[in-house]
Every structure is written in C-alpha cells, then in structure tokens.
C-alpha cells in the first residue's frame, strides 16, 4: 500500500475448509497457513481503505479433492466474501481438480463440479444482483497424465523370505518427489516381454529410506505386481506431467537434473538439456580460508 497507493490488488482468502487426500495436499481450513482467514476479511478492507487500494479480485484454493459438495460450499463462502468489496469483479476458485493417475483413484468430474458451482453463481447473482467473472486454474488436470519418466533398473535386492524384493531404479525423489512427499502413487511399467510377474517394492537411488515409489496413503511400504525384471530393464513411470519436474529436488545427492523431451506430431524435441557435472559445480564458490 505504501509502495503503490491506489493500485488494483487481489487477495487470497482461506475459506475455512479444504480438500485433499492428506494433510499435505489440503491447503484450506484451520491447519493451512495459506491465505487470509475468512473471519479477518474486515482487516483487509481497513488496510485497503487506508492506502486507497482497490480490491478487484478475490482468490481461494482448497487443495486437491474431487468432492462437488466441498466445491459448492467454498464457492458460496468465497462469493459471500467478494460481496464485501464493491470493486471486486473476478472470483478465482483456484485449482486442485483431482486427477486419477492410478486406476483405483477418482478424477474430478468437471461437469458435475462445474454444474454445482454454476448453480451457486447463478443463485447468488439472482439474490444479490452481483455478477462475477469466474476463474479456475486446471493446470494439473490438463497435464498430469501428459508425461512419463523413462528410467532403468539399477539393481534388484531382497531382505529374505520374510522381507521384500526391491527394484532399484536409476531415478528417485530428486526427479519425482510426489511419492516421498505426498505418499502418492504412479503407474509403473516394466518394458519387457516377460510373462512372469514379481511383487516388488520399487525404490529410487537417493540415500533416503523414504525414496520409495510404492507406498500407501499412510506412507507404508507396499508391493507392486510387475513383469519380472532384469538389471538394465527399461521402466516407465507414468503420470509425470504435473508436479514432477517442476517440484523435483534438483541436484539432491548430486544427481543431475533429468533431460526433458516434448513429443510434437510424432517428433521428439529437446526442451531441457542433460545437466553435466560442470553445470552443477558452476554455481559453487570455494572461498579463500584463513
């Protein structure tokens, strides 16, 4: 306000509820720090008035869930907050449209959720006379299943008859962090013609016991029935088009970032070059020590 008096601004509100498969993907409600708590909106109005700021947009984001009732409730609550600011013309309900990467998961039905939200906006306009432009952010919904990670089997080990058989890959949480961070699952395919299968715990190459690709929603180890593999077998990890390369633990354990290719009309085009060791070391400075 002091730097840009009179500017048009937007603010994010925490509507008091959220949605997600676990705490780490739920970004609304009392346990989430994002946004201004919904009962504190009056303070926003006071600050805006003090600095002659125009609140023209209001934003909320609840996490990654697919329950249309939650979206309906959040839309109603966000519209009620928007009514407090006469200059608001746009309501952004954020993203978080759940995408099923695994066959056991349920994607958000955009038609169902959209109909619920539409009814809320139409009813609100009829009741209050206030019409708002609706914005959403469906980035993950559009891109999650548009990418795959290719890797190899580095090693196969086991912990005895009462333990597990581990399929160790030459990739890990440094490239796909979602399983380690969110206990998320990705489809995994062994590219061979083997008709026999084995129950594997699939793990990454980082020096972390949490670098696992096969865990349940509570982060417990699970096995995945896959084609029986040999060292060197090519592996495809699917569903890597969103929140994978963009939020990877780049250079963790000094592993280089993974090159990226774009498939355009049947032709592969490089969009991120392989990273050389000299590129990782280029940002490091060794000072003269006394």
Placement of each model-derived feature along the sequence:
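Active-site-proximal beta-alpha core segment in soluble small-molecule metabolic enzymes
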Residues: 1-90, 99, 111-112, 116, ...
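Short acidic, glycine/serine/threonine-rich loops at helix termini
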Residues: 1-3, 19-26, 69-71, 102-106, ...
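Charged (often Lys/Glu-rich) extended helix/loop segments that serve as interaction or gating elements
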Residues: 131-290
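Active-site beta-loop-alpha junctions enriched in small/polar residues
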Residues: 12-18, 60-65, 94-102, 139-141, ...
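Catalytic alpha/beta core domains of metabolic enzymes, predominantly
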Residues: 93-94, 134
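Electropositive, surface-exposed helix/loop patches at the edges of structured domains
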Residues: 6-9, 94-99, 279-289
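C-terminal helical cap(s) of enzyme catalytic domains, especially alpha/beta-barrels
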Residues: 105-115, 254-259
């Amino acid at each position: 306000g002091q730097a840009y008096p009179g500017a048009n601004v937007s603010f994010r509100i925490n509507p008091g509820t959220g949605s997600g498969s676990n705490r780490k993907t739920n970004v609304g409600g009392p346990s989430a720090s994002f946004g201004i708590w919904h009962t504190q909106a009056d303070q926003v109005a006071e600050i805006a008035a003090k600095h002659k700021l125009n609140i023209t947009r209001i934003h909320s984001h609840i996490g990654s869930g697919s329950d249309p009732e939650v979206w309906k409730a959040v839309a109603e609550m966000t519209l009620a907050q928007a009514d407090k600011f006469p200059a608001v013309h746009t309501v952004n309900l954020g993203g978080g449209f759940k995408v099923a990467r695994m066959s056991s998961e349920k994607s958000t039905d955009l038609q169902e959720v959209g109909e619920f939200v539409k009814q809320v906006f139409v009813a609100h306009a009829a009741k209050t006379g206030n019409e708002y432009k609706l914005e959403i952010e469906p980035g993950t919904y559009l891109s999650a299943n548009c990418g795959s990670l290719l890797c190899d089997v580095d090693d196969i080990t086991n912990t005895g008859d009462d333990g597990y058989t581990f399929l160790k890959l030459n990739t890990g949480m440094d490239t796909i962090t979602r399983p380690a961070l969110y206990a998320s699952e990705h489809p995994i395919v062994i590219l061979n013609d083997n008709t026999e299968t084995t129950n594997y715990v699939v793990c990454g190459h980082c020096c972390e016991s949490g670098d696992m690709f096969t865990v349940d929603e509570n982060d417990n180890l699970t096995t995945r029935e896959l084609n029986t593999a040999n060292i060197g077998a090519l592996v495809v990890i699917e569903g890597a088009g969103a929140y994978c390369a963009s939020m990877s633990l780049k250079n963790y354990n000094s592993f280089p970032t993974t090159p990226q290719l774009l498939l355009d009309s049947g032709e592969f085009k490089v969009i991120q070059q392989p990273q050389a060791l000299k590129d990782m070391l280029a940002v490091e400075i060794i000072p003269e020590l006394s």
